UniProtKB/Swiss-Prot annotation:
Snaclec that binds to von Willebrand factor (VWF) and induces its interaction with GPIbalpha (GP1BA) (via the vWF A1 domain), resulting in platelet aggregation. Heterodimer of subunits alpha and beta; disulfide-linked. Botrocetin and vWF form a soluble complex. Expressed by the venom gland. This is Snaclec botrocetin subunit beta. Belongs to the snaclec family. It comes from Bothrops jararaca (Jararaca).
């Protein structure tokens, strides 16, 4: 079961935070919310679609931080929860390190980590 204000999908809990933070501050914020929580990681298109359903109406076309970056390991993107990045729909090459998702169309954007964005946290229930 997920705590109040969190949504459940496939054994994980998700929550959209309409607060503006840099990527690293958002990741730290997520880890403080629940044991094992991180910025959201996507392991399937269906999971990404579920998160999109939580956020798209509130964002009106903006992007949200997700837990994918190459902040710690240049040239190799990794999820903050330790899951391997093997999401077939995306191939990432960019000059920036942090990834945001645009929920209205599930497109991913690689942008500077210092931008202020809303975000989604996730943890295993």
């Amino acid at each position: 079961d997920c705590p109040p204000d969190w949504s459940s999908y496939e054994g994980h809990c998700y929550r959209f935070f309409k607060e503006w933070m840099h990527w690293d501050d958002a990741e730290e914020f997520c880890t403080e919310q629940q044991t094992g929580a991180h910025l959201v990681s996507f392991q399937s298109k269906e999971e990404a679609d579920f998160v999109r359903s939580l956020t798209s109406e509130m964002l009106k076309g903006d992007v949200v931080w997700i837990g994918l970056s190459d902040v710690w390991n240049k040239c190799r993107f990794e999820w903050t929860d330790g899951m391997e990045f093997d999401y077939d729909d995306y191939y990432l090459i960019a000059e920036y390190e942090c990834v945001a998702s645009k929920p209205t169309n599930n497109k991913w954007w690689i942008i500077p980590c210092t931008r202020f964005k809303n975000f989604v946290c996730e943890f295993q229930a």
